[in-house]
């Protein structure tokens, strides 16, 4: 009996002892599995690091080293067994570094070149015929370089110059001069403040960037009536940016105060300033016929009191000459002028339709008993432009009709029809453009003694942005 009891007790003890041993064995197997997986991951990562180190060594091997005196050190070559120093004759030149001097968080260097070939009645659509006619030519239309930047303190800036502006001593010679130079405080998208020199906010076509125009040149009414670049200050913004983010582009406003004498001038002609305002409304942005579509409307107003000898057509021509041609309008006496415009831009997929009407009242002022020396006149003009991508994002056809009435003599209207093709090699960055322009002079038609009243021109352009 005792022996049987002892046997039962020993059997029970052994059975109970086997349970933790088996559990312990299972636990060790799991741990070993985890360790194996971890080791495998480390091996894979180690292989990746070896590849990266090998790649970096290859890059460093191609970079020249310099000593404390700026002389290039000899390169080291390895035969796989020993490291041999073999001096390689190279030009001793210290490295060059370009870094920003200030605390900017963003700095961008860019620019663009536009080269033209102009044949036929060159620039006749701008009123340059008869006594102001131009000859066939190759022309560097624009060659600009710009620097833009941004600060963490909510300021951005732009400095741009053009190598193809008149140098001021000879209208046929060009030199480098400033186009855009401004600082913009953008802390609040609804109310930004801009100070410096840039295009006054007047006219859709005038404020469209040069590189994004669908015709090679802007229309005559745009050049005759809009104020172009000015020096001053501007308040502008998009009121719905934070209040209604989905419709942030619904409304954009601009209000600026400028000297009114054009760009790169140090003096104001009097103690008055040009005031300019513009509103842009985008009432629709969505899809039509399955295509992205939008409708943009705009309106502008301008007022300025100018003194004698001020050029009021700073972009193109407005003064009607004796033979019906045009030239810049330099005031023979003081004036007060008010201009306004309205524009619309409809886009439906590959199709764009743009129209703009511009008008101006130029009224003479008597100053210190001196009459203005000219009669009041009210120039006006418009253009309508349609374009369509024949090949999506590559080949675009353009048709444009424009007209200007200077309103200085009877029948002084000038009309032009432009037919164009644009080939986008790499978007706007590399673009080829071709325009055929036919121009009618109503003044020449009613006064045939002055010569031809119909003019034809072909313009070709290569554009490259960098």
Predicted regions and their residues:
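Outer-membrane beta-barrel pore domains
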Residues: 132, 169-171, 181-186, 192, ...
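N-terminal periplasmic/intermembrane-space "pro-region" immediately following the signal or transit peptide
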Residues: 21-114, 121-126, 245, 250, ...
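A general secondary-structure boundary signal
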Residues: 32-36, 42-47, 52-61, 112-114, ...
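Bacterial N-terminal signal peptides
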Residues: 7-17
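N-terminal secretory signal peptides that target proteins for export/translocation
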Residues: 1-4
């Amino acid at each position: 009996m005792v022996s049987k009891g002892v046997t039962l007790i020993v059997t029970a003890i052994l059975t109970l002892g086997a349970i933790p041993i088996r559990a312990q064995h299972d636990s060790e197997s799991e741990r070993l599995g985890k360790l194996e997986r971890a080791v495998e991951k480390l091996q894979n990562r180690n292989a990746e690091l070896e590849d990266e180190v090998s790649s970096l060594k290859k890059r460093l091997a191609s970079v020249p080293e310099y000593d404390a005196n700026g002389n290039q050190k000899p390169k080291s070559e390895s035969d796989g067994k020993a490291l041999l120093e073999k001096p390689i004759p190279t030009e001793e030149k210290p490295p060059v570094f370009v870094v920003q001097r200030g605390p900017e968080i963003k700095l961008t260097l860019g620019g663009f070149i536009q080269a033209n070939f102009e044949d036929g009645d060159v620039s006749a659509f701008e009123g340059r015929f008869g006594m102001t006619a131009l000859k066939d030519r190759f022309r560097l239309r624009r060659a600009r370089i710009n620097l833009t930047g941004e600060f963490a303190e909510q300021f951005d800036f732009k400095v741009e110059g053009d190598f193809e502006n008149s140098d001021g001593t000879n209208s046929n010679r060009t030199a480098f001069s400033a186009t855009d130079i401004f600082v913009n405080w953008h802390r609040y998208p609804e109310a930004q403040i801009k100070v410096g020199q840039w295009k006054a906010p007047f006219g859709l076509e005038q404020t469209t960037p040069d590189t994004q125009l669908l015709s090679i040149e802007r229309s005559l009414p745009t050049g005759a009536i809009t104020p172009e670049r000015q020096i001053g200050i501007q308040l502008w913004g998009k009121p719905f940016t934070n209040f209604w983010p989905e419709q942030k582009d619904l409304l954009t406003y601009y209000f600026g105060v400028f000297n009114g004498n054009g760009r790169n001038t140090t003096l104001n002609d009097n103690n008055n300033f040009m005031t300019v305002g513009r509103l842009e409304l985008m009432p629709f942005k969505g899809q039509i016929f399955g295509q992205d579509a939008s409708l943009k409307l705009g309106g502008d107003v301008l007022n300025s009191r100018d003194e004698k000898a001020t050029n009021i057509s700073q972009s193109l021509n407005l003064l009607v000459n004796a033979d019906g041609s045009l030239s810049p309008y330099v005031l023979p006496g003081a004036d007060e002028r008010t201009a306004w415009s309205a524009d619309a831009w409809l886009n439906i997929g590959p199709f764009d339709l743009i129209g703009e009407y511009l008008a101006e009242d130029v009224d003479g002022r008597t100053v210190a008993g001196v009459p203005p020396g000219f009669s009041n006149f009210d120039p006006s003009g418009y253009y309508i432009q349609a374009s369509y991508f024949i090949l999506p994002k590559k080949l675009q056809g353009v048709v444009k009709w424009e007209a200007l009435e200077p309103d200085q003599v009877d029948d002084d209207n000038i009309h032009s029809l432009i037919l164009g093709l644009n080939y986008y090699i790499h978007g706007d960055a590399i673009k080829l453009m071709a325009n055929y322009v036919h121009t009618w002079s109503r003044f020449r038609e009613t006064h045939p003694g002055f010569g031809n009243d119909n003019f034809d021109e072909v313009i070709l352009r290569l554009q490259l942005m960098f």
